[in-house]
Amino acid sequence: LSEVVFRAAMSFDVAALHPLIERAYRGETAKAGWTHEADLLFDTRTSAEELAGLIADPERVILLAHDGDILIGCVQVARAGQDLAYLGMLTVEPTLQASGLGRRLLDAAETEAVARFGARRMEMTVIRRRAELIAWYRRRGYAPTGETRPFPVDPPRPELEFVVLEKAL
């Protein structure tokens, strides 16, 4: 990776952002990386319409990572309470996973949470069965709170329960 530049997503970014997220989370392309959900979930991760709504929401930001003109990653940060921010949709181009970009996106998200929302804590959720991903976040200072949340699908899939992790910023 040469010069990685981070910036907030804007509405015109949806056309490039949506396929990146789908490539990283679902289907055969996701299997080029180690953080995919392709073996657990078979539908789409998000939609272009949902992304446009997230980008337009003043209570959240999606940070993009570019290497030159190429979109290579993103992460979402949202205000979740008085001093709490929520981290979600951390995405790295599958062929670039394990390059350190995820860590850089996480650092940028934490910095943005403090600067934009005045957060002193960051919360996130990870599917309980993703032990290797939970371990990755634990190495970066996130700890399980003991709280769990249902995975938002109908009909419910209890085996996909979320574990809540939190870190002081």
Q: What are the residue ranges of the model-derived segments?
A:
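Conserved acyl-CoA
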Residues: 104-121
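A conserved beta-turn-beta hairpin within the catalytic core of GNAT-like acetyltransferases
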Residues: 79-90, 97, 116-120
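Conserved GNAT-fold acetyl-CoA-binding loop/helix
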Residues: 22-50
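Conserved beta-strand in the GNAT
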Residues: 64, 70-78, 86-91
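Conserved N-terminal entry element of GNAT/NAT acetyltransferase domains
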Residues: 1-15, 19, 163, 168-169
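A short, internal acetyl-CoA/4′-phosphopantetheine-binding micro-motif in the GNAT/acyltransferase core
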Residues: 64, 90-98, 126-127
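C-terminal "cap" of GNAT-fold acetyltransferases
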Residues: 118-143, 147-169
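A short helix-loop-beta-strand connector motif used in the catalytic cores of GNAT acetyltransferases and
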Residues: 46-63
